[in-house]
Design a protein with these regions (language model features):
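Substrate-binding groove/exosite segments of carbohydrate-active enzymes
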Residues: 239-325
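Terminal accessory carbohydrate-recognition/targeting modules of carbohydrate-active enzymes
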Residues: 1-256, 303-310
């Protein structure tokens, strides 16, 4: 298939699917209370699908060892929950269909740009195999920097010639784990759409739909959700780390790899009750001491990066490790 990814002028990497589909990949991103591994695919029709592996290192399960994070995989298809109505007087809503991904950008978030079309329903309409695109969608997936939440923002724009009504349902998907399997009782894993209702889009207009994937202890109240604020915070973090310890070589690929390595090392720090602790990740290594990964590799790097939370995590790792020496 050749080289898929190119370096974006803004510092990320971008892939524009062509004749190199289907293609699948995975990527991990982390915040202080959540890590997620996105397993995604662009299929042979050009549609995007994603499975989210949600890891909550502070919600402990049995046996309470160093791998005891609450984990759950969720493949909820958010765009499939939306519907489009083109009737001026009635309500004959159609599901979004015929997605075609234009590009995917990875730069501290995962952004998927695609176009959608649909077949209208009701008398007088007939099925068309390749209807013209009427909606453009930019979905942005990222972890909350501080909360146990994976955030998804869907920016939807009317690129057609007629007024569209976007129907956003009230939606929540809840799993409650058995209390005897959690160290502090049962846990609630919740997927939800925010701000349900009808949005009217004139040609050229756009709207935002937000989704959250969160977890908490049974009986615990989750804080109010503000995906826009979470996205700004995530972007500020990525920008701050990118501006530190900048590598400049004759090879832009090496420079970009180093920038991504900085972001990954700095983001993957869990705020445990014992202080900040670096997490190697991989759906396995969180909220504990990992002597090689911390003491030998990442701890000496954080002072050179000039990242305060990284420095604090390094000191915590050494303090905890010293108790066993």
């Amino acid at each position: 298939a050749g080289q898929r990814w190119q370096i974006d002028p803004d510092g990320g990497i971008v892939w524009r699917p062509g004749n190199d589909t289907p293609h699948r990949d995975h990527l991990e991103m982390t915040g202080e209370q959540i890590s997620t591994v996105l397993r995604w695919v662009v299929d042979d029709r050009g549609a995007f699908r994603v499975e989210r592996s949600l890891i909550f290192p502070l919600l402990r399960v049995r046996p309470n060892d160093t791998h005891a994070s609450l984990m759950c995989r969720v493949a909820t298809d958010i765009p499939s929950l939306l519907a489009v109505n083109t009737s001026a007087s009635g309500f004959n809503a159609s599901a979004l269909q015929f997605e075609r991904v234009e590009k995917i950008v990875i730069d501290g978030t995962v952004r998927v740009f695609s176009q959608w079309s649909f077949n209208a329903v009701g008398a007088g309409y007939e099925e068309v195999e390749h209807p013209a695109p009427v909606l453009a969608m930019e979905r942005t997936i990222f972890p909350s920097p501080t909360q146990p939440a994976l955030c998804e923002r869907y920016l939807i724009r009317n690129i057609g010639s007629q007024t569209l009504e976007i129907s956003i349902p009230e939606f929540s998907q809840i799993v409650t784990t058995p209390s005897e399997r959690g160290i502090t009782g049962g846990y609630v894993i919740r997927a939800e759409l925010l701000d349900a209702g009808i949005r009217i889009l004139q040609p050229g207009d756009s709207t935002v739909v937000d989704a959250l994937f969160r977890a908490c202890r049974v009986g615990e109240t989750l804080p109010p959700a503000d995906v826009g604020a979470e996205l700004r915070s995530r972007r500020e973090f990525v920008s701050a780390i990118s501006d530190k310890l900048v590598l400049e070589t004759p090879d832009p690929v090496v420079d970009t790899e180093f920038r991504f390595a900085k972001i990954r090392a700095a983001e993957s720090i869990i705020k445990t009750r014992g202080g900040y602790m670096h997490a190697p990740g991989g759906e396995c290594y969180y909220a504990a001491i990992w002597a090689n990964d911390q003491a030998e590799y990442v701890n000496p790097f954080f002072p050179m990066l000039g990242y305060d939370i990284g420095n604090r995590s390094a000191l915590n790792a050494f303090r905890h490790f010293a108790r066993f020496m």
